[in-house]
């Protein structure tokens, strides 16, 4: 029997059980990105990090794997943009040190104490409004913020808010990975 990579390239959102049992692997590139981000976070305890890729290339898996590692000792916040709502409820129930928020919760400040988290992770960051991004960039001055998004050329015109993407790319000191 040949090895079938597609059996191990999973989405934590659609297959939370397999994710929680660690029935997946990261590619060499994903492991390298994760290593660089975690090394910098351990050294500086702050910073902006942004990785992009084509849809289906494991960005969400990488982001969740980083969240799992960072949440070993401290609470982290995972912000979901878009329609990921119901899927992450299973993960939310199981991962006690990972708090899940929808983007609109950040905008309204609805009972959120962002300072309670040691790191902020943002999935589908290309869907962020410029207002929410500004709030997250301010938070990033005192703790790490990790953004994951689709490549610019893969974002539909309805989803693309160039203001937010441009603002993110212009952040001094942001580490980007493609």
Predicted regions and their residues:
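Interdomain "pre-motor" coupling segment immediately N-terminal to P-loop NTPase/helicase cores
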Residues: 1-12
